Amino acid sequence: MVSYLGWHGRGNLGDDAIYDVVQTQLCGAVFVDIPHHPHEQLFASATGLDHWARGSSLVIGGGTLAGRRYFRRLLDRGIETIGDGDCFAVGIGVEDPVFQGFKSGSEDDELRRWRPLLSRFDTVSVRGPRSAELLADIGLEVEVSGDPALLLPQPEIESENGLIGVNLGFGDDLWGHDPERLVTEVGGAVRELVSRGHRIVGILMHEDDRDRTERALGGVAARIVQPEDAVSAVAELARCSAVVVSRLHAGILAALAETPVISLEYQPKCRDFARSVDDERSLIRTDSLTAGAVVERVSDALENADTIKRTVGAAVKMYRERLAADYAKVRSSIGLPII
C-alpha cells in the first residue's frame, strides 16, 4: 500500500499529471490519499483506512509542497499514520521563501521545520536546481531528477505552423500581485500576434483559467480547449509552434512535447523548472511583463525553435532516465515487480 501526499483530483491537470505518473511507475500498489481536510480525516479513522495504512510506504508525489506549512502538517500526520513505513519523495518542488504570496505558508523559516521530516526519507530528489539549493541551505544534499510529469508519454504529433497556444492561470498569487495587468498585457500581445498572421488557441489547465483566458483572447478568433487529462494536454501543446503559458505544468508538458515556451514567471517555481532544462530565455516575470516583450519572445522562440527543441529535448531525455531510475528504486524498496 502507498500513502500518497499530493494535490490531485482537484481540477488541476498538473497535479493530476504527477499522480498519473506515480500510479504508472508504481503499478501494482494500492494507493490511499493522505487526508487533507478534517472530514477526510474523520472518514479515514471511521472506515479503518488509518489502520490499513499502518506500515505502508509514504510517497510525496511532486508539486511544490516542501517548505509550505500546510503540507508539513499533512506530512506530519501521514508519517505518524504509517509508523515504521518507508518514505519517498521523487522530483518534488521546494517553495522559495523569497516569494511571499497570499497563501504561500513559507514565512518564519518554515523550510527548516522540514529538515527532520525529510531526513527520515529513504529517497529525496527534486524538480530543479533552485529546489536543490534551498534544501542544501538546511543541510540536505539531494539530486535534481526533474518533474515527475516528464515521464508521461511523449506525443508523436506535428506542430501546426503559426499556431500559438496561450495558457493564463495561476494559483494563489503572482509576482506583482496584479492579475488584471497580466490579462491586459497578454491580451495586447495576442492581438498583435494575430495581426501578424498567427492563429491562437487557449489551453486550460484548470477550469479557473477560463475567465482570464477568455478575456485575454477577447476580440480575436480563437478556440479555447480544456483537455480532459494530462496526456490530452500534452497533445494540445504539441500542436502549437510555440506557447505562452503561466501555469507551471503547462510549461513542463510543453517541454515534454518539445514545443518552445514563453513562460510567464508568476512564482519562483517557474524559474526552478526553466533552469533545470536550460531554458531561462523563456522566462518573463509577471511584475515586468509587457505585451511587446511577449511578442518579441514569441518571435525569437519561433526563429530559434530548432535550437530550443534540441536543448530542452536533451534535458528532458536525461530527466526521464533519472526519474525512471528513482522510481525503479522505490519499486524495489516496497517489493513491487520490475516493469
Regions found by a protein language model. Name each.
Residues 1-339:
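Active-site anion-handling motifs in enzyme catalytic cores
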